[in-house]
């Protein structure tokens, strides 16, 4: 499997985001489940696509929040590739891209109708935090954060909830 940097408007990436939207609309029973403006080419700093056997099977993006942090957006893996390590590989690549840009904290929002995502982020070392930004007041949102600052052993530290 390869993780490739792509443009936001890449056709395969756009198709993955479309598939994610269809799945989320079905899970939430509505297309109105994302607080705030959706990510766009103008505000997405990194967009990665996972490719397996020549086929795009997952994606994820980073949007800078401030000088030291970014938000993970549009993390998605096609259903038939879930449980194969694609999501973990994408997440680690996004974290590495964040560190390369000097962002040592990554945050994300997922939702109450996504128990698989909640389990995944907890397993990957993310800690639940209070809702932030456009998610404040949302009854469908659950937010997470991970501190990417290496400790003295070189492993990533985890920040406790604020």
What are these regions (language model features)?
Residues 1-73, 78-80, 91-93, 97, ...:
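Acetyl-CoA-dependent GNAT
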Residues 8, 107-110, 118, 122-123, ...:
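Conserved catalytic-core motifs of GNAT/GCN5-like acyltransferases
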Residues 68, 84, 100-104:
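Short coil/turn segments at alpha/beta junctions that flank glycine-rich nucleotide-binding fingerprints
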Residues 78-80, 84, 112:
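Active-site acidic-Proline motif in GNAT/NAT acetyltransferases
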Residues 91, 98-110:
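Conserved GNAT acetyl-CoA-binding A-motif
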Residues 115:
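Conserved catalytic core of two-component sensor histidine kinases
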